[in-house]
């Protein structure tokens, strides 16, 4: 068992300041316990005070609006130079204990409250027994009182019946004393009450509303005095939702094409400013001739870069661009020219074979620089065989076409006039071809149109003229 003594004590400070805080040895002088302001304006707080011995003291101090102060209503002691504290002894604490077992509420300004229940431990059996005995005694007393009242009421009823038999009166005229026979209080009308005594939500019922209030707790149906004059009761409209939506959509789509004519007007205004050609037919012909003239130049330049083989003979170079420049003639003449062109292709193939053989025997060495010249590969047997077969196939086609047309003799005479190039001429042609390869493609393309084109097709033109 600890020898500590505990007492509830109320600390107070008079009215005036805004805040008052209590501090002391209980919180190591931290100032953590504020006093509660009461309705009177003063500050109070009730708290338990612990004392280790009877001779021990409880030291404390007040902090009023941030200033440490000492109250004159409590005892003072000097701890050191210039420092004073209030203190309480056991005698001061015992005097204030008015009610044993009562506690005070600090938030309520130190008001007393009932004895708090036990915080821990099982409830005592003696208190239970006492409560049971008290409850039994109360019940027995209530039973005795109820039996006495019943006896008295029965005796009074018997006496009244005897009196009724003597005087000739009935029990209906006599009022009983029991609760069942007591009449109910008569309901009082609100209108009869004094003007000051009225309900929170007064109800003013008029003659019109009383007729329509058929349902209890609700307004009821509304009866209109003139239903025939109201259009909503007579007119009925059947509206199709799809038709109505179509109409509305059509009406809304009208303002959309407004921007159309503005664009067209701008185009029409700008159109006359465009230049118009006087002779469009002549211009198209000139463009076509220019294209035909450029195509042979491209064909002549491309083999210099890509093909490893040498260029064909000058006669072949002259004959190819002339074929593109053939002027439109009648149908029979065009067919003849096509056949003659195929015959020249066979001659070109033969000239290429002769050039390849001559290059194998004698290689021409020149001092001119070589531009993009690929190494020459020897021809295989298959390639030579294909070269031999190609002129035979072309001759067979020529014969078939000659049989269909009646100009066999003219073609044979013209082909016999053509002479095959000799070995010396082939050497000269190879030297010229190597020089042309070293030259730039632009220079070759510019020099070609300056040469006079005298070949097979040139002779044909002279004949037709």
Swiss-Prot record:
Keyword terms of this UniProt record: DNA-binding, Phosphoprotein
Skewed-composition ranges (Basic and acidic residues): 337-363, 385-398, 404-428
Residues annotated with Phosphothreonine modification: 182, 295, 366
Positions with biased composition (Low complexity): 166-177
Residues covered by region (X-DNA-binding): 160-161
Similarity-based family: Belongs to the CRP1/MDG1 family.
A molecular function (GO) term: DNA binding
Function: Cruciform DNA-binding protein which exerts an enhancing effect on the cleavage of cruciform DNA (X-DNA) by endonuclease VII from bacteriophage T4.
This protein's encoding gene: CRP1
Gene3D superfamilies hit by this protein: Immunoglobulins
GO biological process, one term: signal transduction
Top-level division of the source organism's lineage: Eukaryota
Pfam family membership, one: AMPK1_CBM
Name the UniProt record assigns to this protein: Cruciform DNA-recognizing protein 1
GO cellular component: cytoplasm; nucleotide-activated protein kinase complex; nucleus
Modification Phosphoserine occurs at: 153, 156, 271, 319, 343, 394, 440
Bias-annotated ranges (Basic residues): 127-151, 451-465
PTM description: Cleaved in the vicinity of position 160 to give an X-DNA-binding N-terminal subpeptide and a non-DNA-binding C-terminal subpeptide.
Record-linked PANTHER family: 5'-AMP-ACTIVATED PROTEIN KINASE , BETA SUBUNIT, CRUCIFORM DNA-RECOGNIZING PROTEIN 1-RELATED
Biased composition (Acidic residues): 156-165
Ranges for region Disordered: 107-227, 247-276, 298-465
